[in-house]
Amino acid sequence: MSKAIKYAEKAAVYAAKGAWVVYERLNRISPNPSFTPKWSEKPLLKSYQKEKPPLGWPRTTDSLCPKCVPEIRKQILDGKLPHEVLLNEKVGEIKAQIIERDGKILMVKDCPKHGHFEDVMSIDPAFFKHLEESFPGRDIRAHNDEKLHKHGTSTVTHGRGSVLTIDLTNRCNMMCDPCFMDANQVGFVHELTWDEIKTMLDNAITIKPKRQMSVQFSGGEPTLSPYFLDAVAYSRKVGYNSVQAASNGIEFAKSKELCRAAAEAGLRYVYLQFDGIGNAANSHRKVGNLFDVKLQAINNLHEAGVDIVPVTTIINGINNEQVGHIIQFALDNPKKISFLSFQPVSFTGRDEDITDERRFAQRYTLSHMAHDIKTQCGIGEPARDWFPISFMSTFSDWADLIHGPAAEWGQLSCGCHPNCGIGMALMIDKETKESAPVTAFLNMDKVAKDLAKVNDAARGKWLSVIGFGLALMRNYDPFQAPTHFKITDMLRKMDKTFNATGKDYGSVKGDRTMEDIKKRRSDRWNFLFIAGMWFQDLFNYDFRRTEQCIIPYATQEGEISFCAYNTGIGWRNIIEKMHMTATLTKWYEEHGRHEIFAGGKKVGMSHVGHELVLNMEHVNSEANHTLDNLGIAKNAREERIRARDTKVKSDAENAKMAQLYREHVLGEKPPADGIVSVNMIRPATNNAASPINRNPQPAEEPVAGD
């Protein structure tokens, strides 16, 4: 684009600044009251009516003892305590302080029984402060929800969430570390019936506010469920616009037919486990060709019309150096990747009993992520380009306003706590691959504040659309935008995202066709959203985050916050045990064993080939050996083996000391040639010699969890 056009756009920016002054003054005159939409029994909130939890530091919050909770949960699982105790008592709860010390934000807490605990929340206080100050406030309080939100202090109290997660099965075809659910290791199968799946989806749309959500089918591995495709189709039938699967991609890589069938059923996204570039970077997952599997899954799914969201669990010392590689992969393939989700590790499931040494070494926060992306990619200023995920709720409020009181559904709204998740957007030219952070050419902080004023005035659809347009234009810098990006491209992007004007950009509904998919993909500009979602564990648990969770789990016992289900008090273990389908032995007798890829086993694929652009230096890079060099265990299995070896060594040393005591203190003679006679070891009360096995067979001591 010529400089002349950029200067013309700059003139339009100045014109928008002047028009905004007039618009804002008119808006101040008798603003309209909020309406109560069909999808809620409470009116839309003005920006100044939104509640906020205590923020800043030092502050006190409610947390959990990392030792009390597993002890109490075990009593419930063993039948010694009823699970109702979780509804009526503050089980395992203790106070915690969030403080600043030595340039870090920490959570510190003390249990009268188990002592002191602390963990890092952020390595950058300025970044942490920026996120909390950018939080716009909580969504409408949840209502008409008594049937599903009934979990004591773990109850979700605000909003509707943005991703309804349903675990179809706890069976998996991998044996990962880490794993939220400890798949394939709990001794039983928990797999939803078709009636249970339909009931959960039907119940979910009774809660108010009735907002659009992404329904995510998870597991285990959801594609192992016989009802996977039916569940996708039924979700679309009851009205959800976005249906996704959280998958390791193995079945999608093996079968193009499955990809096509999933797309036809209405699957829109696959949240694809994706821990790095190259097989070495994925070696901690113990599948021999896992990166090749990911590439084939991306190829097959995109070809079928399903969009892919690579999801990376980041662990310090395991794959933290891969953050930049993964972003470069997305930048190199803008026609196939439009969303990245990074998830700093949560020590739960297989890792709940983690040692302090490994926890401190592997802990990775959202602040680590923001700084790693800047260091590894040269992208993003932490306190300028990153915002809490909930920052986008102001834009959802605007969309609720323009769609009016008769809308059947509210907009998807990410109203989570500012400590939960962050996001940054890049605008990428699909043709030239030039990119820039959206916040480099659009002052998003000012846009959000302007938009809040538009929302508070509530002037109706078209005046609100004009107000949003002026807010965008007056805060736009054309000279910082990608070369060929225009103001009109920006306005079109917002219109496409929120369906503001009703223009057809290609349907996203359940009856969408391949033509609709191609139409939406024809946009020259890829709005690459990079998200970081940090799920809690027992060491950093904060009930203020749980109360406004945006990722509820649908279960046989109602809807439960993601963190309360997987970590927190651990509702997952309790509910799956309560509603277990069969013991493993019984399941294997009736259904046989499903194939599991572990121990370096490779996945066989009938179709091999893709058109993805790869950086071969990244592909061929070695695995991260940081923890090996430090002598620290990398996962729970290694910790168990080390603990066993330490015990064996300790037992041997104790036996040696006992022998020395008998020799030098008691005056006993040592056995000749180191051979201990039967008389020396037989019980004193038994004069008969015990029979001796002349041909003993070696036995390997099992490790718990093998």
What are these regions (language model features)?
Residues 63-69, 112-113, 171-182, 564:
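Local cysteine-cluster metal-coordination motifs and their immediate loop/turn environment
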Residues 118, 122, 132-257, 261:
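Conserved alpha-helical substructure of the radical SAM core
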Residues 3-6, 10, 14, 20-33, ...:
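Radical SAM enzyme [4Fe-4S]-AdoMet core and its adjacent flexible, acidic
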Residues 185-187, 278-284, 350-353:
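A short acidic, helix-capping loop that chelates divalent metal ions and anchors anionic groups
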Residues 35-165:
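N-terminal [4Fe-4S]-dependent radical SAM core
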Residues 494-653, 676-678:
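C-terminal target-recognition/interaction regions appended to catalytic cores
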